[in-house]
């Protein structure tokens, strides 16, 4: 049975009609070459300004982009699945916002989920291999690398501060590993989320801001206090900048199985309320007609 368009689940992604006419970048060997000329200029001036307004998590869709700057990029993951952890600064109408966008690589003919190709932003030629630069969050290898980073207390040095992967005591108890299932909750939201092993939700924070993050602070406090009726905090990825301010990049929490999300719950309750109202209205109308019939008799 085929679902109608308005019945598609929340994780549904419209298939790409055709591959865009991407700019082709040339790399000799390393992903870090994306940060060097001429690749950097091509990404900042052409690829990213065209790609960002199509993303649901990008807050500046209604304003023309003035400039895009890649703030930093640091190598992460294994050599078979190269990734650059990165943040970009976008200036529109005199206001600058910072977003997290990890860059990943996939072979153009790679067989697998459609999402990495749908989120691609540039074509790349590396020696004899042709592929695509995409949002690394769409790659399962990246998700597994982040989980491993938390488990190993990985620390990365970047030009804008130290990036720390930190677990809580709760994470080890889950026994998650390389074989744990990775399941995306939704293609894109204001942030990006994925479920690992049906027990952990990893959320990548898209719009990055310095200072205490309320979700992390509350989750850490309630988990430490042993509060049972929450998703426990399992880990985090934080960049500490030159001013000593923390910038939350990712947060891992326990996954609570449920029957849909808040949007579906709201829709279902509205539907039931409308149905009840219509039923009551029909009942009153029937009583009115019956009363008229009795009067005429």
List the predicted regions and their residue ranges.
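Conserved ATP-binding subdomain of kinase catalytic cores across diverse folds
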Residues: 1, 5-14, 71-297
């Amino acid at each position: 049975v085929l679902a109608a368009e308005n019945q598609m689940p929340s994780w549904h992604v419209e298939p790409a009609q055709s591959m865009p006419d991407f700019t082709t970048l040339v790399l000799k060997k390393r992903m870090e070459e994306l940060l060097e000329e001429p690749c950097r200029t091509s990404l900042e001036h052409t690829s990213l300004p065209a790609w960002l307004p199509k993303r649901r998590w990008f807050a500046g869709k209604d304003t023309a982009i003035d400039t895009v700057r890649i703030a930093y990029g640091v190598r992460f993951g294994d050599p078979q699945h190269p990734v650059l952890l990165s943040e970009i600064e976008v200036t529109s109408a005199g206001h600058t916002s910072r977003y997290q966008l990890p860059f990943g690589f996939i072979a153009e003919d790679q067989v697998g989920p459609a999402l990495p190709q749908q989120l691609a932003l540039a074509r790349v030629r590396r020696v004899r291999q042709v592929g695509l630069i995409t949002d690394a969050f769409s790659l399962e290898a990246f998700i597994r690398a982040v989980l491993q980073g938390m488990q190993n207390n990985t620390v990365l040095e970047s030009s804008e501060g130290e990036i720390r992967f930190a677990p809580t005591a709760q994470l080890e108890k889950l026994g998650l590993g390389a074989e744990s299932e990775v399941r995306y909750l939704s293609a894109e939201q204001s942030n990006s989320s994925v479920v690992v092993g049906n027990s952990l939700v990893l959320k990548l924070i898209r719009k990055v801001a310095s200072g205490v993050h309320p979700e992390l602070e509350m989750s850490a406090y309630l988990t430490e206090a042993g509060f049972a009726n929450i998703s426990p905090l399992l880990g985090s990825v934080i960049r500490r900048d030159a001013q000593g301010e923390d910038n939350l990049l990712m947060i891992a929490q326990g996954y609570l199985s449920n029957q849909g999300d808040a949007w579906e719950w709201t829709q279902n309750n509205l539907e039931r309320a409308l149905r009840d109202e219509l039923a009551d209205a029909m009942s009153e109308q029937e009583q009115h007609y019956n009363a008229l019939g009795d009067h005429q008799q």
